[in-house]
Design a protein with these regions (language model features):
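Single-stranded nucleic acid-binding surfaces, predominantly the OB-fold ssDNA-binding core
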Residues: 1-96
Length: 96
């Protein structure tokens, strides 16, 4: 499995939500509405989810293994940080 494209759809500067991301896997599968969230200790990736009939949020799609989760999260966070860095260079100021 290879992430072949990462699109930063939206950057958010207020609250804990930092970005909305879409990824493409193997040029065959797109996953939208992945969130970059500022946690208490670090940034993390939240996979797309829906609220079930009991009001509990359940992931719609997610990596199965810890290794796959770490790989997906690592690539997404790297792309997010690179995007912020490029915005800072373009604008001459910090974005977040």
């Amino acid at each position: 499995m290879q992430i072949t494209d990462i699109k930063i759809r939206k950057i958010i500067t207020e609250g804990r939500l930092r970005a909305i991301i879409s990824i493409t896997i193997d040029n065959m599968l797109a996953i939208h509405d992945i969130k970059v969230v500022q946690g208490d200790e670090r940034l993390f990736v939240a996979m797309p989810s829906r609220k079930d009939e009991n009001g509990i949020f359940r992931d719609v799609v997610h990596p199965i293994s810890l290794e796959a989760r770490a790989a997906v999260e690592g690539e997404i966070l790297e792309a997010y940080k690179n995007h912020l860095y490029n915005l800072e260079i373009e604008n001459g100021e910090a974005v977040v």
